[in-house]
Amino acid sequence: PILSFTFPFIAEARYSAIVIDSDNGKVLYSRNANTLRYPASLTKMMTLYMAFDALSQKKILLNQELLVSRRAEGQTPSKIGLKSGNKITVENAILAIISKSANDAATVLAESLAETEILFAKKMTQKAKELGMKRTNFRNATGLPNRRQKTTAKDMAILSKALLVNHKNYYH
C-alpha cells in the first residue's frame, strides 16, 4: 500500500508532500517533506491514535459514555453539535472525528483521556516522539490554529504507518 500526504499551499514553499510504500517504508516521492507546517485537522489522526491506544489498554471502552464539557460544546467550526452536560460514547466520538472532523468530539475524547486538552496535547507530543516524529509538536486535539502546533509531511507519514501497523483492528 502507498501512503501519501500533501500540505496545502504556503507562500515560501508551495507545498509539502511525501509518498511512501507502507510495506517497506521506501520513500517513492518527497518534496519539502521535512518543512514545518500547521497540521490543521490532520492533528486528529494523533487524537485517534491516542484513543485507539487507550482502547487497546482497556483504559476506555467503545460503549463508555463521555461527558461533554462547555469547552467541548464551544468548539468551532466543524462539529456535530454536542451540548454541555450531555454524553457521547467513545465509539460515536471516534466516528464523528473520522466522518465529520468533529472538533467537539475530539475535545471530549481529549478531556476524558487526560483531564484537560492541554495535558492531552502534551501526551500527543510525547507519543509522537516515541513513534519517531521528530519535528512534531501538538498544542490541541483538534488542529485548530496554534502557532506552536507544527508537523511535517514526513512525520505524518510516520503516524499513518503507525496507525496501520499498531491499530489495524480499528479499520473495517
Residue spans of the language-model regions?
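A short, well-structured edge-of-sheet supersecondary motif
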Residues: 9-30
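Extracytoplasmic/periplasmic beta-strand context in beta-sandwich domains
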Residues: 15, 64-66, 136, 171
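Acidic/histidine-rich, surface-exposed loop or edge segments in extracytoplasmic proteins
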Residues: 26-34, 103, 107
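Active-site-proximal loop and beta-strand segments within enzyme catalytic domains
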Residues: 52-119
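Bacterial N-terminal signal peptides
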Residues: 1-6
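A short glycine/serine-rich beta->alpha loop
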Residues: 32-37, 143-146
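Active-site SXXK
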Residues: 25, 38-66, 156
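A conserved catalytic-loop motif detector
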Residues: 89, 93, 101-172
